[in-house]
From Swiss-Prot:
Belongs to the metallo-dependent hydrolases superfamily. Adenine deaminase family. One of its GO terms (biological process) is adenine catabolic process. GO terms for molecular function: adenine deaminase activity. It catalyses: adenine + H2O + H(+) = hypoxanthine + NH4(+). This is Adenine deaminase. It comes from Syntrophobacter fumaroxidans (strain DSM 10017 / MPOB).
Amino acid sequence: MKWDTGRMARIIEAAQGKRVVDLCIRRCRLVNVLSGSIDTVDLAIHEGFVAGWGSYRAAREIDADGMYVCPGFIDGHIHIESTLLAPAQFCAAAVPQGTAAVVADPHEIANVLGLSGIRYFLEASEGLPLDFFFNLPSCVPATPLETSGAALRAPDLDALLPHERLIGLAEMMNFPGVLSGFPDVIDKLLLFQARRIDGHAPQLGDLGLNAYVAAGITSDHECTTLEEAREKLAKGMTVMIREGGQSRDLAALLPAVDEHTWPRCCFVSDDVHPDGLLREGHMNVIVNRAMSLGMAPVRALSLAALTPARHFRLDRRGALAPGYHADFSMSPTLNPWQPERVFKAGVEVARDGRLLLDLGNGNGVAAPPSPMHITRLLAEDLVVPAQPGLLRIIGVREGTLLTRKIVLPPKIHEGAAVADLDRDILKLAVYNRYVPDRPPAVAFVQGLGLKEGAIATTVAHDSHNLIVAGASDADILHVVDAVRKSGGGMAAGRTGAEVDVLALPIAGLMSDQPVERVAERLEQLQGRARAAGSGLRNPFMALSFLALPVIPELKLTDLGLIDVSTFSPVSLFETS
């Protein structure tokens, strides 16, 4: 919603009480994140903006009867693709939770579809009752250690910059490239020096962090320890406190937020699955968890609205004050925050957890075709010939994206290393879905818990090849074939039985179905994985990050097993 001469003149008049305002929320308890106070006021709205509070005549009135009103929430870092929902369906799920805007990183769809994927997001999110801002992906592909569906260089990003909702550069995951001065990395950093550049530097500190910040990188959402957060705050970064579907760092990082640092802290979800979005909520659940851990309510609400708006220079957002966007929710209680009524630009868009608008499939924008070029499914490709030495194994850890490097003697059968269910060791494989006739990369993983069958997904950060873990080679081939035939998605099953599949026709990442339907199908898959023995809260999300070679310690891409600490491939067997 843009300002022009006429609108500004009318709002100036309305703010002075010289014009009847569109809406007045009478007797509301305004959570003022600018002053830290909570005041009972009559809040006046005109043409989608706050006119002020005081004595106003209004065309329409709502008696809040003491309900609390706070600014709409802003998620400062989210991958919409992680919700498995198209933009319109994500909007329908998030807006009733009080979310007014997101700053999204489309590097998932960009890794699959390149610029056409970013353009699809821009077009599909246009005109929705939630503001989608985007940071352009900095790392497509994320690293040279994997194969993606596209490669984006600085000139490619430059071509998109005129779009008003493209506001910065998304997480610079290639921190070794920053520290080593890789030319393509430097070109991207220079292109965005006048804008915000998001970081991604887990466990980086000392002189390396000095160099990373000196390059103009302004935030990080990868802090997992209090010491890490404090060092990054001390060196000028905004710390985005992540509380998402897989990584939950709120409890560990909350002590870093104090009187001096809170303006440079904000809450983000990063990755959240549809079942969590439907069952728990979005930014509102992070706010409520922060309050339950002892954070003052006004501050918790500030970190979900004001501070992300200030960090990203989203003018007139993140607070309710004269001239600010009239995006807000109303709750009968301050703690917990329960958004019973949600307003966007002064219009009620959700009530009692339901969107009041029928978005259908959004604005009708069609997604580009999804690549699925897995043409080779051979049992011999999964065989790991036995070698001298111990086996390097990826260790999954509940509640974090960090994995452990485990070294154990392999189980050998007929001259080959195989899955060892007694020790919770499964075979792991990554199939390249962009180049036909490629054999998979194969490794082993501990911690997924399956006792039979296999689970697979084309949501495999960040290049989104097909990743699968299974108790046997036959199970792996059976489930991979089902995903391939669906055109991309998630699946669970075993040899000799029907495979459950959640089809994701949009880039192999997202569904065009409503959140309720997607969450139901996902829960069926999770139930299938749990019935097969997995004890993880979200085995599919855990699986989806095992191919991401920018988060320590050990990962598997289509090019092989990767030691993240050295940013290089390693053999499956350790001989020394």
